[in-house]
Every structure is written in structure tokens, then in C-alpha cells.
């Protein structure tokens, strides 16, 4: 029946500074190899991060059986940095070290180096709220909403709305299980939610410039300036929606426990750096929202105290998981991305191709068909017919003759952990296994 409220502001400031001073003497091997009388360098960088968060909590129990918890708040995060580097060579004496940078002859000769830069400022602002309701700790409902704005996106797409709904039923608190003493906890849950992703570098929506090649201008070499990367003002939030069903249990005086989850995820407006035509673009890649990805799987965990005594405990837990991902849409029809280049020798090209309706993890390679009577390699072509890899001057090792084969992603990932505790001592053993993959 009581009501509890709490409001709390939080301010965080993180400032980091890095400085490095280096001097290489006249007699150092680097100076001798480059015919220089010493060398000095200064390196400086700093990183500034500010975070502000304010939120209010609300808690109320009414009619003894009903509990409501709620929180609402605001958060702000900002990051930025800068750096400066300089180097000079050929100093008259060693004794001054790196503290008289101007006397090195490389500066007067125009051969000293100096550069500086400033990171684009990044900001993230969030308004959020969450409410949890339970009846006798038996039936539970939760709802949350978050509105986030990120400076990484274009002016018209900076804000995204993300939400989640979930419900749970603690069956172990029902009257029909009250006398079943070996069941300590049994709960089923169902949830659906949408989250956003802005996990890529800054500066993809605003034109940035830097000095590059030197060009002669009126008899003087001057640096030319060019854009750092292609910009895309239409970038927007990548969104992941997930439907999840789960079961939690604890049995036999909490000596045996476990959980099972099955999920279906979909990612829309995937953020990816893709190839770009030159011209009209200046660089050969551009960040885009290019498609959607489907992800399905399950996870299972079973653990327990095998031995439990006053001074000694042996705990073991087993975890299994399965996951399958498929590209549902990737850019325009017929678009694909070739990745993971084979090492030399032979220059066999790439091993992976991402395209519509293809399961992630498959290899995209030439399919070996054996050797002919002369010992030459044979492959399956695009029509699945056996042809020589190289027929005289004609090579059949072309992309259209590649096939999707195998899969590098394991069908099941298994882990088995063991922990032994004796008084204040403990020993842990972790075993991992990847099953059924190519």
C-alpha cells in the first residue's frame, strides 16, 4: 500500500590525454641508416566524453497483491577528440633532446612533418520510460519506450522510436503447485521488442575534408584538399525486432536449474559500407541502409550443484545454442557483396558472397569435380556440368561457375563449465565445442 518515489541526476565527465616525446640520438642506428643527426617527435591527443542522466523511480503496492514499478528519464552523451603530431631531424647537439624542436635543419629545409586533426563531435540523446506490473509475483507485464536521437544520421532521420512488451507467468506460485516441494521456480515468458543500432563511425552524413597530395601552384608546392569519404545524408537507424519465448526453472532446493529460449529476429535498414560508382562519387565505398536480415535460433542451459556440503561445492553447467541467419534483402535486385579473399598463391578470388535469400556462412567457391586422365583439375560449371578448370587458353574459373557449398557456422555451439569451491579456494574449468560445420 506504500508509495515510494525517487529522482536522481547523474553527471559523468571522462577526459583522457596522451602525450609522447621521443628523441633519437646522433649515434642511434636509425639516425646512421638515414644519414641524419638525431630526430625528435611530439605526439599529443585527447579524448573528451560527457554523459548526463536524470531519472525518476516510482514504486507502489496496492491491495497487497498488486505491485507497480515505473521509471522515466533523460540521458545525454557527447564525445569528441583531437590530436597533434610533429617531427624534426638533424639537430646540432643531442643534449637538448626533444625540447628544442625548431633547431632541427629539416624544419628550415621544409622536410619536417606536422599534422593535426579533430574528430567530428558525436551526440546521443535519449528519452525513456519503463513500467513493470505484477500480481502476487505470479503474472507479470512489462512495457518500455525509448526515443533516441543520434548526430550520426542525416537531419531528417536522427530520431528513432524503440519499444518492447513482455509478459511472464510464474507457474510455481499457482495453488496447484504449492504443495509440489521439489519445484522451487517455474516460469514462462514471452516478449517482443524493437531496438536501434548506430554502431558505425562518425562523419558519414557531413562532408569532411583533409589535405592529401601536394600540387605546384605559382612555383610553390601546396597541399590539395579532398573529401574524407562519400557522404549519405539519408542514413537512418538500423532496427532490430525480436520475438522471444522462454522457460526458466529451478528444482530440488535450487540444486538443479536451467532455462530455454527460442527467438526470431529481423534486422531492417541494415547499415553497411558498400561499393560505390566512381564517378559520380569521389570514393569507391559509401555507407548505406541496404536491406534486411533474418536470424532464428534457440539457447538451452542446464546447471546444478553436483556436490554441496559445508566446505565444498562442485557446480557444473551445460549450454547449447543454435543459430541460423539469412539475407532477406540486400540492396537492389541482383546486388551482391563478395568478401574474404583467399591468400596467395593462385589468386582464387573471394570465398564468401552475400546476396538475397542466401544463408550466411556458406562458401562461394569453385566446386571440385576431380582430375581428368591427364591429371588436370575439373570443376562443376554453372549448369552443374563437369568442365576443365582451364581448357587451353579458355579459363572456366569465372564467378558465374562458382557454387554455394558448405557452411562455416556451426550447427550447435556447446559449452560445459565446472567450478570447484573449497572454503576460500576455487578452481574453474571451461570447455567449448563447435559442432557440425565446414
What kind of region is each of these model predictions?
Residues 420-421:
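Oxyanion-binding "anion nests"
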Residues 1, 5-24, 35-351:
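Extracellular/periplasmic, surface-exposed regions of secreted and cell-surface proteins
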Residues 218-228, 266-290, 325-409, 417, ...:
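Surface-exposed, extracytoplasmic segments of Gram-negative outer-membrane nutrient-acquisition systems
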Residues 255, 424-426:
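Structural motif
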Amino acid at each position: 500500500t506504500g508509495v515510494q518515489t525517487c529522482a536522481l541526476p547523474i553527471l559523468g565527465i571522462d577526459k583522457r590525454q596522451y602525450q609522447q616525446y621521443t628523441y633519437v640520438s646522433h649515434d642511434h642506428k636509425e639516425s646512421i641508416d638515414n644519414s641524419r643527426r638525431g630526430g625528435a617527435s611530439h605526439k599529443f591527443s585527447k579524448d573528451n566524453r560527457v554523459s548526463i542522466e536524470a531519472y525518476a523511480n516510482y514504486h507502489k503496492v496496492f491491495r497487497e497483491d498488486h505491485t507497480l514499478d515505473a521509471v522515466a528519464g533523460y540521458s545525454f552523451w557527447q564525445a569528441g577528440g583531437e590530436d597533434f603530431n610533429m617531427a624534426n631531424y638533424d639537430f646540432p647537439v643531442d643534449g637538448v633532446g626533444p625540447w628544442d624542436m625548431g633547431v632541427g635543419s629539416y624544419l628550415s629545409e621544409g622536410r619536417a612533418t606536422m599534422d593535426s586533426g579533430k574528430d567530428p563531435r558525436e551526440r546521443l540523446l535519449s528519452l525513456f520510460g519503463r513500467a513493470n506490473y505484477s500480481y502476487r509475483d505470479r503474472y507479470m507485464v512489462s512495457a518500455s519506450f525509448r526515443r533516441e536521437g543520434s548526430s550520426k544520421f542525416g537531419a531528417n532521420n536522427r530520431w528513432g522510436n524503440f519499444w518492447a512488451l513482455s509478459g511472464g507467468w510464474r507457474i510455481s506460485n499457482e495453488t496447484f503447485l504449492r504443495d509440489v516441494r521439489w519445484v522451487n521456480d517455474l516460469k514462462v515468458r514471452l516478449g517482443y521488442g524493437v531496438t536501434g543500432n548506430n554502431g558505425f563511425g562518425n562523419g558519414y552524413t557531413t562532408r569532411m575534408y583533409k589535405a592529401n597530395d601536394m600540387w605546384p601552384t605559382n612555383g610553390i608546392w601546396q597541399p590539395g584538399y579532398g573529401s574524407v569519404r562519400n557522404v549519405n545524408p539519408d542514413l537512418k537507424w538500423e532496427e532490430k525486432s525480436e520475438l522471444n519465448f522462454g522457460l526458466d526453472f529451478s528444482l530440488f532446493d535450487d540444486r538443479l536449474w536451467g532455462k530455454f529460449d527460442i527467438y526470431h529476429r529481423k534486422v531492417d535498414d541494415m547499415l553497411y559500407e558498400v561499393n560505390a560508382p566512381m564517378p559520380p562519387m569521389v570514393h569507391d565505398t559509401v555507407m548505406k541502409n541496404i536491406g534486411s536480415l533474418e536470424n532464428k535460433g534457440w539457447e538451452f542451459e542446464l546447471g546444478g550443484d553436483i556436490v554441496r556440503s559445508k566446505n565444498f561445492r562442485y557446480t557444473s553447467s551445460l549450454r547449447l545454442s543454435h543459430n541460423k541467419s539469412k539475407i532477406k534483402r540486400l540492396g537492389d535486385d541482383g546486388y551482391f557483396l563478395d568478401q574474404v579473399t583467399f591468400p596467395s598463391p593462385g589468386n582464387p578470388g573471394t570465398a564468401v558472397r552475400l546476396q538475397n535469400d542466401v544463408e550466411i556462412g556458406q562458401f562461394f567457391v569453385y566446386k571440385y569435380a576431380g582430375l581428368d586422365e591427364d591429371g588436370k583439375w575439373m570443376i562443376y560449371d554453372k549448369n552443374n556440368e563437369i568442365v576443365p578448370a582451364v581448357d587451353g587458353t579458355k579459363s572456366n574459373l569465372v564467378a558465374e561457375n562458382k557454387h554455394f557449398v558448405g557452411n562455416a557456422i556451426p550447427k550447435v555451439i556447446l559449452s560445459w563449465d565446472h567450478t570447484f569451491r573449497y572454503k576460500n579456494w576455487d578452481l574453474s574449468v571451461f570447455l567449448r565445442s563447435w559442432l557440425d560445420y565446414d
